[in-house]
Amino acid sequence: MAPSRKFFVGGNWKMNGRKKNLGELITTLNAAKVPADTEVVCAPPTAYIDFARQKLDAKIAVAAQNCYKVTNGAFTGEISPGMIKDCGATWVVLGHSERRHVFGESDELIGQKVAHALAEGLGVIACIGEKLDEREAGITEKVVFEQTKVIADNVKDWSKVVLAYEPVWAIGTGKTATPQQAQEVHEKLRGWLKSNVSDAVAQSTRIIYGGSVTGATCKELASQPDVDGFLVGGASLKPEFVDIINAKQ
C-alpha cells in the first residue's frame, strides 16, 4: 500500500443487532486501540444510525448501508444522503452485492446514487465484484471493469470515494479470495483507474477487499501492496473486528 493511502476498515453490520448487543459491541470498539494511520467506519442498520453515532467515539465514523438518488419525495422506505448527514453519519455504502442481487439494483441506479451522495457531501464506499459463475467463466475483469466504469462516470472528486472489491462468491460463504487473488484484481482495478481516470486518482484511491474477512485472514491480505483495507461483514459484529482494524500493525 502506498504511504499516501490511509488504511480503511469498514464494518457492515447488515440487518443485524438490537440496541442491547450493538451497545455492547460499541463499548468494545470504543475501548479498542485504533491506529492513527487507520480510518474506521461502521455501517449500522438504518434504524440505528443515530444510536450508533451518539454512542461511538469520534475516532470511528458512521456510514449508512444505502441511500436513494434524490433529496426528498414520495419514495416509501428510502432515505436520502441529507437524512444520513442529519444523523451525524458521513459515509454511505453503495452497490453492495446484496443490493445488486437480492434487491435487483442496476449498475445505472447505483451510479445515480453515487453521484447524488457525493453531491450531497457524503463519502462513498462503492462496491463491485463478480459472482462465482462469472469467475469460473473467466470474465472477472470484464464484470468489475464494467461496474467500475458506471461508478467512475458519476464521480467528479475521487477523494471521497473508496472502492470495495467484494467477490460475491466469498461474501458470507466462509470462502475468502486468496491474498494473491485479491491482489491480482486490486492491481488490475488500479490499472483501470490509471488508464481511464488518471494516474493521480489510481495512486490515491483506496481499493479495499470484502468477502469473509476474519481476524485470521486479515494480516496476510493487508500485506498485499494494492489492498488498502477491508469491508467486513459478519466479523464486524464480533470482538475480532478489533484485530482486523489493527491488521497493518
UniProtKB/Swiss-Prot annotation:
The modification Phosphoserine is found at residues 80, 106, 159, 198, 212, 223. The keyword rRNA-binding does not apply. GO terms for cellular component: cytosol. Signal peptide: none annotated. There is a cross-link at residue 142 (Glycyl lysine isopeptide (Lys-Gly) (interchain with G-Cter in SUMO1)). Substrate binds at residues 12, 14. The modification N6-methyllysine is found at residue 194. The modification Phosphothreonine is found at residues 173, 214. The modification N6-acetyllysine is found at residues 14, 156, 194, 238. The modification N6-succinyllysine is found at residues 149, 156, 194. It catalyses: dihydroxyacetone phosphate = methylglyoxal + phosphate; D-glyceraldehyde 3-phosphate = dihydroxyacetone phosphate. Its EC number is 5.3.1.1, 4.2.3.3. It holds the Pfam family TIM. The modification 3'-nitrotyrosine is found at residues 68, 209. It is found in: Cytoplasm. Pathway: Carbohydrate degradation; glycolysis; D-glyceraldehyde 3-phosphate from glycerone phosphate: step 1/1; Carbohydrate biosynthesis; gluconeogenesis. GO terms for molecular function: methylglyoxal synthase activity; protein homodimerization activity; triose-phosphate isomerase activity. The active site is at 96 (electrophile), 166 (proton acceptor). Keywords: Acetylation, Cytoplasm, Gluconeogenesis, Glycolysis, Isomerase, Isopeptide bond, Lyase, Methylation, Nitration, Phosphoprotein, Ubl conjugation. HAMAP family: TIM_B. Triosephosphate isomerase is an extremely efficient metabolic enzyme that catalyzes the interconversion between dihydroxyacetone phosphate (DHAP) and D-glyceraldehyde-3-phosphate (G3P) in glycolysis and gluconeogenesis. Homodimer. Belongs to the triosephosphate isomerase family. This is Triosephosphate isomerase. It comes from Canis lupus familiaris (Dog). The gene is TPI1.
